[in-house]
Amino acid sequence: MDSSSSVVYVGSSSKSRNFQSKSKGSITSFSIDSRGTKKSMKTLLIPEPEPTSPEVIESSVSSVSAESETPISIIRKKKQSEPRFYSSPTNTFYTEAKQSFTNTEFSECASISTIGIGGIDLEKNGVMIYRGSIGSDVSDESSSSGLSNAAYKPHRDNNDKRWVAIQEVRSRVGSSLEAKDFKLIKKLGGGDIGNVYLAELIGTGVSFAVKVMEKAAIAARKKLVRAQTEKEILQSLDHPFLPTLYSHFETEMNSCLVMEFCPGGDLHSLRQKQRGKYFPEQAARFYVAEVLLAMEYLHMLGIIYRDLKPENVLVREDGHIMLSDFDLSLRCAVSPTLVRFAAITLESKSSSYCIQPTCVDQSSCIVQPDCIQPVCFTPRFLSKGKHRKKSNDMSRQIRPLPELIAEPTSARSMSFVGTHEYLAPEIIKGEGHGSAVDWWTFGIFLYELLFGITPFRGGDNRATLFNVVGQPLRFPEHPNVSFAARDLIRGLLVKEPQHRLAYRRGATEIKQHPFFQSVNWALIRCTSPPQIPQPVKPMDQAHSVRHGFSQGHGHVGYDKPPTVDVKPSGNYLEIDFF
């Protein structure tokens, strides 16, 4: 055994201990009994590799490093540049955000090239978090990607009766869903680029909402891009308060989107049924909280909604909401950042103060330890501690959790879109607008739910636009609404977008407002809704559609083909400058 060999102990038995001796070109196994006698010598020769020139070695090393660059180095590079995400015990949004980034990262590693999601490219070096399928994995149509749908749709419930019905029909017909598989029952409503019908998937008894867009009409109005944008956005969504695109198909004349049917109608109709035609504050808080989470998710994806109003907030069969109608939405880039806040030292001699500028009522200032950053903080519990032992500095500090901010603040559009009473001042002025318009409309939305009217409505559309730009915000004397609700509305309806609540920090800032103090964000889906809609019997509805999609021409089975109203309604307006 030469000097270059090494001996390794590999185990023992009842009568001996076993060793291996490794040297250049061979491995020798042997054992030593209790008397110290070496025996059972076995030698395994290892063949020498053929000599390789330095040039070949260098070439092969560079080749291997280039190949290994793909999955591992991308992850390492991203981890160096991406913020870390921490979950909050009271907010599942951060866990969902982390899952969103994980899915995006996985999709990048899977194909080693830029992956398009609904026509949007994911940037390798930036942090763009469009989350969704490659192709049409959210519909019933097969995807060309080999990746699992579940990797992109964690909220998809395969036990959902709608998915079960679709799979049942697909297995029976052996193809994707088509127009002939649906029987249209009644018209539910109409939008700017199409009409929505209640439809039954034939042979299953399961109802869907089918949006039918007439190709010729939307092409004549130059709305094809709007229709395509809506479909791509729907394909990318995966959130409890946003719609699922179950299928999409085309006929000769129509383009159709198959979504969930919400039997509770919309919040506008539901508000009209309330006593006084406004919601109690507790009910309004429930609805706007769920809308806020949906908007937060959209902004994380770089989607500015731009059309929030009660008519577009639908009520599901369980009483929770679903945001609908994305044909006016704007897609843009977003760069999420993780902000860490310094620890806040509590001084017993300090007086009450508020961190948020919109909160001016000291009686509403309380400690919110479950928030990421205290909104309004009063160290009143320290004033009772005269007989307490003096604690150290560490115990007298609040250390806020890191805060994820994913607000697309850099987005700019010159489009003049929306409903007159909900238009933000910067849209009317033509100054260009970004994500802050959604928080203006959120303020109008909350105002209407609480008071039954919008704050700037005039005698006609021209007067309404003038009021939005030039008139101050006023509140009616009745009904009686809490200070926190009025304070939140004041913060949202600031005419200068850069001073508007949530302009920088987005929905996180709104969620920390005292108006939402009683909301448990982590368990909001378990909260009992203010009202559960009555079960709907679709076949008993009046004004039903006669048959279904007629074969051949692709018309809806109505007395005449459905047409998209070429003239916008009186409250709706859209002008694209570029």
Curated annotation (Swiss-Prot):
Alphabetical list of CDD domains matching this protein: STKc_phototropin_like
Residue stretches of biased makeup (Polar residues): 25-34
Pfam families assigned to the protein according to its UniProt record, in alphabetical order: Pkinase
List the effects observed when the gene is inactivated. Answer: No visible phenotype under normal growth conditions, but the quadruple d6pk, d6pkl1, d6pkl2 and d6pkl3 mutants are deficient in lateral root formation and mildly agravitropic, have fused or single cotyledons and narrow and twisted leaves, form few axillary shoots, are almost infertile and impaired in phototropic hypocotyl bending when exposed to lateral white light.
**Which residues are noted in the entry as ATP-binding?**
188-196, 211
Q: Which UniProt keywords apply?
A: ATP-binding, Auxin signaling pathway, Cell membrane, Kinase, Membrane, Nucleotide-binding, Serine/threonine-protein kinase, Transferase
One GO biological process this protein is involved in is: phototropism
- For the motif PIF, what are the positions? 575-578
Record remark on domains: The activation loop within the kinase domain is the target of phosphorylation.
What family does the Swiss-Prot or TrEMBL record give for this protein?
Belongs to the protein kinase superfamily. AGC Ser/Thr protein kinase family.
What's the protein here called? Serine/threonine-protein kinase D6PKL3
Q: What organism is listed for this UniProt entry?
A: Arabidopsis thaliana (Mouse-ear cress)
Name the gene behind this protein.
Answer: D6PKL3
